[in-house]
Regions:
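Charge-biased, low-complexity intrinsically disordered regions
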Residues: 12-13, 17-18, 22-26, 119
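Glycine-rich phosphate/pyrophosphate-binding loop regions near the starts of catalytic domains
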Residues: 31-140
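Short, basic, low-complexity termini and linkers enriched in Ser/Thr/Gly/Pro
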Residues: 5-10
Length: 140
């Protein structure tokens, strides 16, 4: 994918022009790779940076498995995190919401698919959220 695209007026714009800082994103990935790796269980085969997750059910030890997954959000608790500048716990809570939905189906949480979206990357905040997500995965 090219870093430069043309808008309808044929003006070339870059990711940077639209507020995307690729260098900051790469620095964040470097900071969190060991954190995310610490959450791996038998069956986890994906590495950080890919655009999908891999889970080997044979390695997980289940017989005749059925996958159960959940996507959820933290809702208005996000506003509390912003107001208190406390971002670690929002990561834990995010995983807990999804893990509880999986558990309610009688299943075991095996993996967590994250999506971190922001208007502008604040690496310090992102790092705290992702540390919380990792802790939530360990607790689940």
């Amino acid at each position: 994918m090219t870093e430069k695209i043309k808008n309808k007026n044929q003006k070339i714009i870059t990711y940077s022009d639209s507020g995307v800082n690729i260098d900051e994103g790469n620095k964040l990935v470097s900071q969190i790779s060991s954190i995310t790796k610490s959450t791996s269980i038998n069956g986890t085969t994906a590495e950080i940076g890919g655009f999908g997750g891999l889970f080997d059910l044979k390695k997980s030890g289940f017989k005749d498995p059925i996958l159960v997954s959940s996507t959820d959000g933290v809702g208005t608790k996000l506003q509390l995190a912003i107001e208190t500048k406390s971002y670690f716990n929002i990561g834990i809570d995010l995983v807990a919401m999804c893990a509880n939905d999986v558990l309610a189906q009688g299943a075991l949480p095996l993996f967590f698919m994250d999506y971190y979206a922001t208007g502008r990357l604040n690496r310090k905040i992102a790092l705290e959220v992702i540390k919380g997500i990792a802790e939530g995965c360990k607790q689940s």
